[in-house]
């Protein structure tokens, strides 16, 4: 049964035929207006037009350029030079009008692409445009239609449509609605639609409140904000996710863009992390249940195993774009051994090299796939970890894999190799190369923004490394354990430093982009008495006055130019190059590099102290910049020393890792004759008074004496007594071999 409705429009009558619901839908129709004087010539009748119109009819006033029907948002554009819609192949359909009605032309369109970047596929609708009004007659978008996708920015008409919708529904004032432009554009810049993902409503609203606070905007309430979101991202659904008693409402079908600054916020971990089942319900060491460690410490949502696996894969793929997965493991050197341990052969040496190479490649693959928790199992398998009675009764190592390794290299021979010093050194060098590759994979650029969820996962991974390795090597000789733990400790420390540096870089980036803060920093810096700073620091650092003055001038100039973070990084790199250039190619280069770090830190602390005493308004910004520059200087010096010594940065940092073994030897190596001669030359060239020079020489003798190892047969003795609130008195001129301090008493042995 069919019904008819009549629409009155500026004296014209248009009869609209509607059909019952359930008839087959036809493609969306776009209507173009035809001048009145051509009405009679262009009138054509098509009998099938009665099947075009579904049961829903909506009227829009002529002044309204936008209208809605269900989930469809369609916009009419006033542009004349460009074509609004791209027409695909299809037949033409014409509307039947009354005798005095204005004639319109109907063009079939299967996909509509607007200039604003919104692509829509809809079914069963028609647009009729006339001088008095615009009418949309058609079905709402159902599952049979095409999906809606958004590009980076929406057209102005899309934003106007959302604002007008809110004005009608909530009665917003014109002043308040003018603020919605920035809110809507912020949503489009930071969020995008995607299938199979969700965001907590509270988290998204908290991001919005932070945005309003940073830009000093008046936020709308949560209900109006929800309408804002739905007016921009059409087709969003709401789901209640989480465990019983801890569930929250989520927007399903929306996510944060990968390049959005919101990825660096700490609270993004609540939705960037994979949703997984509670840890106590999982089977230990099941690979796909807990892949990347990102979800450590997060409650699950009770999803099924297939859903968890899909979420894990999607999350892993999202984070892998921030890694450098193309880096391969470098080739290891051959083992150089003079004599084989008893009961071993050269074939066993080759088996050890092959097995350890495969072991390191497996670790690299696990890290590339962000399966951090599996590294513990790899260590346990290689080192034949076999607890007598596991606490949870699970089998930690696979019997098949363990039997294969045991057949290639029995554990008894592995123990013998671990006691050989040549094998220990070879394995340490392999570890340094592997860990350096892992660092470059996880953090290829310390200044590039990294999602906070990935950063936290890396830090949790670094925190667990030493414990995992020590537990897996419980039955291995202590010498090998110390060497391996020292290497993995340097690796963990490097990960912690680089993630902290990255976090500081992103925080400082916002400061360096703020013009008002930069101007305030420059004004406060010009009030600092650098002459007084140099006078106080020169006695400690003994730096060239001209070099310090040049650094001050360059720093102010770079700050005044409002340089970017990358430009500041290039400036700091140039400072390191100029400071260490006199020591290039000399054995004292590592010592000079560390001394430069100390001097840089001392000077910067003096400047910060002056700013503090003056109650500088930009003290917080300077403090943040100082932390970043000190950390980045450490990073640069670390790589310069590694380049000068021909080692990896991990090897440089691991040089002093084993305190029980490395302290005397490394100190003796570091305090070589070249460095001591340089110190003597500096003392001879100085123009200090005799009393001051005598005090310096006494202090130097005391420090050098404390660092010399007590390896000789006879131990020379001297006594340094420190009475309460009295000065130190040296009672003998003999060399102080070893010093130990307890309270205020120093005893020389």
Curated annotation (Swiss-Prot):
Report the main location listed first in the record: nucleus
The domain of life for this entry's organism is: Eukaryota
Query: One GO cellular component from the entry?
Result: extracellular region
Mind listing the UniProt keywords for this protein, alphabetically? Developmental protein, Differentiation, DNA-binding, Nucleus, Repressor, Transcription, Transcription regulation
Listed under GO biological process in this entry are:
cell differentiation; cilium-dependent cell motility; DNA-templated transcription; endocrine pancreas development; epithelial cilium movement involved in determination of left/right asymmetry; regulation of DNA-templated transcription; regulation of insulin secretion
Q: Which residues bind DNA?
A: 183-258
Q: Cite the GO molecular-function annotations of the record.
A: DNA-binding transcription factor activity; transcription cis-regulatory region binding
Which InterPro entries does the entry mention?
Answer: DNA-bd_RFX (IPR003150), RFX-like (IPR039779), RFX1_trans_act (IPR007668), WH-like_DNA-bd_sf (IPR036388), WH_DNA-bd_sf (IPR036390)
Subcellular localization: Nucleus
Q: Which family does it belong to?
A: Belongs to the RFX family.
What is the documented function of this protein?
A: Transcription factor required for ciliogenesis and islet cell differentiation during endocrine pancreas development.
- Record's PANTHER family? RFX TRANSCRIPTION FACTOR FAMILY (PTHR12619), TRANSCRIPTION FACTOR RFX3 (PTHR12619:SF20)
Provide the protein name: Transcription factor RFX3
Q: What is the lineage of its organism?
A: Eukaryota, Metazoa, Chordata, Craniata, Vertebrata
Q: Which gene encodes it?
A: rfx3
């Amino acid at each position: 049964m069919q019904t008819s409705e009549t629409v009155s429009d500026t004296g014209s009558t248009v009869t609209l035929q509607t059909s019952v619901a359930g008839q087959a839908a036809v493609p969306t129709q776009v209507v173009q207006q035809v001048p009145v004087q051509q009405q009679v010539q262009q009138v054509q009748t098509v009998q099938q037009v009665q099947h075009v119109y579904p049961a829903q009819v909506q009227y829009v006033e002529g002044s309204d350029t936008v209208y809605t029907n269900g989930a469809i948002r369609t916009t009419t554009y006033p542009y004349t030079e460009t074509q609004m819609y791209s027409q695909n192949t299809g037949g033409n359909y014409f509307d039947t009008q009354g005798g005095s009605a204005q004639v319109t032309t109907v063009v079939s369109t299967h996909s509509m692409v607007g200039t604003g970047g919104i692509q829509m596929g809809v079914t069963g609708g028609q647009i009729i445009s006339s001088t008095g009004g615009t009418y949309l007659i058609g079905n709402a978008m159902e599952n049979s239609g095409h999906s809606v996708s958004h590009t980076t920015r929406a057209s102005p008409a899309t934003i106007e449509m959302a604002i007008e919708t809110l004005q009608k529904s909530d009665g917003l004032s014109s002043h308040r609605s003018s603020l919605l432009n920035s809110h809507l554009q912020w949503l489009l810049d930071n969020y995008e639609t995607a299938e199979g993902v969700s965001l907590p409503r509270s988290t998204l609203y908290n991001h919005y409140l932070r945005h309003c606070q940073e830009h000093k905007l008046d936020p709308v309430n949560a209900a109006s904000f929800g309408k804002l979101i739905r007016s921009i991202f059409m087709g969003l659904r709401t789901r209640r996710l989480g465990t019983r008693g801890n569930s929250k409402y989520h927007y399903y079908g929306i996510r944060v863009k990968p390049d959005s600054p919101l990825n660096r916020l700490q609270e993004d971990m609540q939705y960037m992390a994979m949703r997984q089942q509670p840890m106590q319900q999982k089977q230990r060491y099941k690979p796909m249940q807990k892949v990347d460690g990102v979800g450590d410490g997060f409650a699950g949502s009770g999803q099924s195993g297939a859903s968890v696996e899909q979420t894990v894969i999607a999350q892993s793929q999202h984070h892998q774009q921030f890694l450098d997965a193309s880096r391969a493991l470098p080739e290891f050197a051959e083992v150089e051994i003079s004599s084989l341990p008893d009961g071993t052969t050269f074939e066993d040496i080759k088996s050890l090299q092959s097995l350890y190479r495969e072991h390191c490649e497996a670790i690299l693959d696990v890290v590339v796939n962000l399966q951090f928790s599996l590294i513990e199992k790899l260590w346990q398998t290689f080192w034949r970890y076999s607890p007598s009675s596991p606490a949870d009764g699970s089998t930690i190592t696979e019997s098949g894999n363990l039997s294969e390794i045991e057949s290639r290299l029995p554990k008894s021979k592995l123990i013998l190799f671990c006691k050989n010093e040549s094998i220990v050194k070879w394995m340490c060098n392999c570890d340094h190369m592997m860990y350096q590759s892992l660092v470059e994979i996880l953090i290829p650029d310390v200044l590039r923004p990294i999602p906070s969820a990935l950063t936290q996962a890396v830090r949790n991974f670094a925190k667990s490394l030493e414990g995992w390795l020590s537990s897996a090597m419980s039955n291995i000789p202590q010498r090998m354990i110390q060497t391996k733990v020292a290497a993995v400790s340097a690796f963990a420390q490097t990960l912690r430093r680089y993630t902290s540096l990255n976090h500081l870089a992103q925080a400082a980036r916002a400061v360096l982009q703020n013009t008002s803060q930069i101007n305030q920093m420059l004004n406060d810096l010009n009030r600092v008495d650098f002459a007084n700073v140099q006078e106080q620091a020169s006695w400690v650092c003994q730096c060239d006055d001209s070099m310090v003055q040049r650094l001050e001038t360059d720093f102010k100039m770079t700050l005044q130019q409002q340089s970017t973070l990358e430009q500041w990084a290039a400036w700091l790199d140039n400072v390191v190059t100029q400071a260490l250039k006199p020591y290039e190619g000399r054995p004292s280069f590592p010592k000079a590099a560390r001394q430069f770090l100390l001097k840089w830190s001392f000077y910067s602390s003096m400047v910060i102290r002056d700013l503090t005493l003056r109650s500088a308004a930009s003290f917080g910004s300077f403090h943040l910049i100082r932390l970043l520059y000190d950390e980045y200087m450490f990073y640069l010096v670390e790589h310069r020393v590694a380049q000068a010594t021909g080692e990896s940065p991990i090897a440089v940092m691991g040089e002093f890792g084993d305190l029980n073994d490395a302290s005397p030897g490394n100190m003796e190596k570091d305090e070589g004759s070249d460095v001591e001669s340089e110190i003597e030359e500096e003392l001879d060239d100085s123009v200090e008074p005799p009393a001051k020079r005598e005090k310096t020489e006494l202090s130097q003798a005391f420090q050098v004496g404390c660092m010399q190892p007590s390896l000789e047969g006879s131990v020379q003795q001297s006594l340094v007594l420190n009475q309460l609130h009295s000065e130190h008195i040296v009672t003998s001129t003999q060399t102080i071999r070893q010093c130990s301090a307890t309270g205020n008493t120093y005893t020389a042995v």
